[in-house]
Amino acid sequence: DGAKQPHRVLVQVPDNFDQEKRCVVVAASSGSRGIYGAIAVAGAWGLPKGCAVAYTDKGAGTDYYDIDTHTGVRLDGTRGALGETLAFVPEVPVGMSGVAFKHAHSGDNPEADWGKHVRQAAEFALSALNRAYPEAKSFTFDNTRVIAVGISNGGGAVLRAAELEGEWLDAVVAGEPN
């Protein structure tokens, strides 16, 4: 709510995804690791088990903007110029120079929305599964097991997600949450 900068989400669906044993593992990256930061935590377990895996950078990713050259990171990870679709563009006061990082310079308070970001990643996974398997019964929180996983402040994010209303999570694994 009120965030100026988006959080990233990513979904991986394994070739052996079982539509009859529907499973989504949703993970929040720890620290400022970006969207790929939780692959070793969630993907390494969930994908071989046939689960789809959804990730969020929880609004604290590694996106940066070079104030001096007016360049930043595109959504595909390559560098781009101001005016292109960049993952993060800060409000820059006149005369400022240096590099701005999304986590520190977005002007948002991403921690306030960590739980929502985890839930949105899970919702994105269900939407992706509905697009990938249009002939299947619709994927919903009621018919798909959802397990949230995170370590460090990624663990804190999944605990915040567990505090949200509704019965959308089936399990939470939080290692050393903060």
Go through each PLM region and give its residues.
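Hydrophobic or amphipathic alpha-helical targeting/insertion segments
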Residues: V24, S30-E84
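Active-site nucleophile loop of the alpha/beta-hydrolase fold
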Residues: V173-N178
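Alpha/beta-hydrolase active-site loop
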Residues: A81-S97, K102-K137
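Short, hydrophobic alpha-helix immediately C-terminal to the catalytic nucleophile
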Residues: R119, L159-E163
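Catalytic-loop region of hydrolases
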Residues: D1-C23, S32-G43, P48, A100-D108, ...
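Short helix-terminating capping/connector loops at secondary-structure junctions
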Residues: D18-K21, P134-T144, E167-W168
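Gly/Ala-rich beta-loop-alpha elbow adjacent to hydrolase catalytic centers
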Residues: I147-V158
